[in-house]
């Protein structure tokens, strides 16, 4: 299929920031893909990109295990922008000198622009940038000039404009680099000559055509959880092929208040999709009876879900494709190319060997924030598009220890109150994740004139970018007070509320 947008390729040399580069470029309205540094020049040529960016990385270009690229990439005649390690690699390739710095430079630095190449067009002569390197370019390759310097880095930026080659020692993709976005924009638009054309409207049009071509008159099966990824996949595919899609929604009894009903109302009634709801509460609760260990609970819930899905799928005839909500981050973090990832996932989720499906993964070029934008474009309600991250085992790991119907009801009701009050306070887009948990401990209290001995409910709320690290959310005291008063008064068998003020690390976001 012919691409309808310009593309910038990012080569991954191991930087923790490499995904940020691709995301920044997409935010400009230009499509960008991240590829391993081992990609060949021929493969890049076939993609017809407008330019290439070499990411940073933790290695030394002269050290053992140094990562290199196909040297023929430099013969493609494409603009290349090397960031940190990428600049050092370019320097080495063209005969310059890279040496170990006297001390590793990490943190903010003041950059002074000495030569206004296209990269620095309309940018201030002095700007704050983010450094993170242990090596330095100490000798320029022939044909290159110094673009910028810093106190500890005499060659903080370089260029050979005749060949459209540029390098910087700092990280423009990181927020701490105050004009970093403008610098990347200058490369994308000023050097590479890209035009804006990457947007969700364009993506939907291209992806619908691709799904129709792939599926033809065959049938597709989708496991619908009500989460944003599976919801967007289901709606997108349904828009493409209509009733050729069948969704299976497993209600394991561990969902939040009103969730099962909400899923059916939204997708079965709202989008008129063919959704098979499986009520498996009793089946799951029987398996979980007496189980206290969190890992064992996770395993039981995960395995049982597969068995239930298998049972229902086997009742359906002629299902050729399985739809999955695989995101671009899943593919990138697996360290493999898209095709290899699909191959390794032919038994998705541990499905039995005799259940062979061809995969459809329409979101596998999108980041999470882009999936939310896509969901909104497709008309999916905000409460699903902006749904809180929810673990696969559901409330099963928010009830610490053995799961009972009574404990599930306490978590379900208290969590509903928390969500309602957070939304009322206008904090639902500011806090990355918030929920209640039942630690299983009881304490003495007084309600009316009587002594009580009831459960404690814990509130967990965190701010984060990606969930890898998190800080506890500073919810205003008056909001916390409302939440506490409501839970104690409206939820049976609760007489105490505690607020978790631990960051990640050392704690995890979930309690189990």
From Swiss-Prot:
A GO MF label: GMP synthase activity
Q: Write down the chemical reaction(s) this protein catalyses.
A: XMP + L-glutamine + ATP + H2O = GMP + L-glutamate + AMP + diphosphate + 2 H(+)
- Which residues are in the GMPS ATP-PPase domain? 198-387
Q: Which PROSITE patterns match?
A: GATASE_TYPE_1, GMPS_ATP_PPASE
The biological pathway it contributes to is: Purine metabolism; GMP biosynthesis; GMP from XMP (L-Gln route): step 1/1
Q: Which UniProt keywords apply?
A: ATP-binding, Glutamine amidotransferase, GMP biosynthesis, Ligase, Nucleotide-binding, Purine biosynthesis
Q: Name one GO cellular component term.
A: cytosol
Give the EC number(s) listed in the UniProt record.
6.3.5.2
- The Glutamine amidotransferase type-1 domain covers 7-197
Residues given in the record as ATP binding sites: 225-231
Q: Where are the annotated coiled coils located?
A: none
Q: What Gene3D superfamilies does the database record attribute to this sequence?
A: 3.30.300.10, 3.40.50.880, HUPs
Give the active-site positions. Answer: 84, 171, 173
Q: HAMAP family, per this entry?
A: GMP_synthase
| Subunit composition and interactions | Homodimer.
| Summary of the function given for this chain in its UniProt record | Catalyzes the synthesis of GMP from XMP.
Q: What protein name does the entry list?
A: GMP synthase [glutamine-hydrolyzing]
Q: What is the species of this protein?
A: Bacillus anthracis
